[in-house]
Design a protein with these regions (language model features):
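Conserved N-terminal Rossmann-fold NAD(P) cofactor-binding segment
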Residues: 6, 31-75, 84, 311-318
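Hydrophobic Val/Ile/Leu positions in short beta-strands of Rossmann-like dinucleotide-binding domains
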Residues: 11-12, 37
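N-terminal Rossmann-fold NAD(P) dinucleotide-binding loop
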Residues: 19-20
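Conserved S-adenosyl-L-methionine
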Residues: 28-34, 139-142
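Rossmann-like NAD(P)-binding element
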Residues: 55-119
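Rossmann-like NAD(P)(H) cofactor-binding subdomain of soluble oxidoreductases
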Residues: 91-159
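C-terminal substrate-binding/catalytic lobe of Rossmann-fold NAD(P)-dependent dehydrogenases
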Residues: 138-143, 153-333
Length: 333
């Protein structure tokens, strides 16, 4: 089987539903011939490895370990789903304290065991914060760390397709920016449905303002809805989309959706947030975001919410004050 690379890809949290699905997706997409599975829960990890062995895949070497040093040593790409899962009634922010500590330890381990890693995708929630913590403690460049932020945009696409009764293929350029959660900024001005600008349909019989507001609510509550329907948090969609991200970083197909990236541009500073980006072998690069005044105001509101979360982490002592970030990671200006 031809693969994008032969370099080592480590899946952190591989015993979980997201991690195990990421591993299978990476193999089926032909990312690399060298996949390492890591999880501190050794029995579950071995079970995942056995299932993958039983798939009979060809051209791939699958290893597994519960030793983080072994898992990260030599890794050039990492996707990390190794945080606590969100349960019914919890918001992403409820997870903040425990997962912030996990992200700090992970970042330090990256710096110790694989400082030459090329790209990391962090997907455990709240990803805007866990990705930021990982970046700071890993010592990596901002271009080398991204977070999963695309599911809100894919959910917008899905809801619009359902509303208009059309294939998702004709719903284009759906975008949400800012926070990966209930405080996201949902953009209408970028989207088209069957070639028609979405913004021009809002307030008409085709899509009343009330219906548009309902769609936005469904998008912002999409993750909670999956929990209500399935009794557990999403795993198929985050697995697939996060592997699409790391594939782009390996030189594969361009990533089609917004990604969480470190932003510090004078208007939005010292934060990880969903942004319009490109992901290539050179890492993640920021693009310009254009929206209506209302959309830009929503993005600023989302940014302030993320800043409050960031400042809470600083108050917890997980991160130092912003003025000391450069001393922690010299790639942060």
């Amino acid at each position: 089987m031809k693969t994008l690379t032969d370099e080592k890809l480590t899946i952190v949290g591989a015993a979980g539903m997201i991690g195990s699905n990421m591993a299978q997706t990476a193999i089926m997409m032909g990312l690399t011939s060298n996949i390492c599975l890591y999880d501190p829960y050794a029995p579950g990890l071995e079970g995942v490895a056995e299932e993958l062995f039983h798939c009979g895949f060809e051209g791939v070497n699958i290893t597994f370990t519960s030793d983080i040093k072994d898992a990260l040593t030599g890794a050039k790409y990492i996707v990390n789903s190794g945080g606590a899962a969100r349960k019914a009634g919890m918001t992403r922010e409820d997870l903040l304290k425990g997962n912030a500590a996990i992200a700090e330890e992970f970042g330090k381990n990256v710096k110790a065991y694989c400082p030459d890693v090329k790209h990391i995708v962090v997907i455990f929630n709240p990803a805007d914060i866990t990705g930021l913590i990982t970046l700071l403690y890993s010592g990596l460049k901002p271009s080398q760390v991204t977070t999963l932020a695309a599911l809100d945009s894919t959910r917008l696409r899905s809801e619009l397709a359902k509303h208009f009764g059309v294939s998702m293929d004709v719903v284009e350029n759906c975008r949400t920016y800012g926070g990966h959660g209930e405080q996201m900024a949902v953009y209408a001005s970028t989207a088209k449905v069957d070639g028609k600008p979405l913004a021009g349909m809002i307030g008409t019989d085709a899509l009343t303002k009330e219906q548009w507001a309902e769609i936005q609510t469904k998008v912002t509550k999409g993750g909670a809805n999956i929990i209500a329907l399935r009794g557990r948090s999403s795993f198929q969609s985050p697995s697939y989309v996060s592997i699409e991200m790391i594939a782009a970083a390996m030189g594969g197909k361009p990533f089609r959706w917004p990604a969480g990236a470190y932003v510090s541009n004078g208007k939005f500073d010292h934060i990880m947030m969903a942004w319009e980006t490109s992901i290539t072998k050179d890492g993640v690069a920021l693009k310009e975001i254009k929206g209506t005044p209302e959309e830009e105001a929503a993005l600023e509101k989302s940014y302030k919410h993320l800043c409050a979360l960031r400042d809470e982490v600083i108050a917890m002592g997980v991160l130092p004050p912003i003025s000391e970030w450069h001393a922690l990671n010299q790639n942060i200006k």
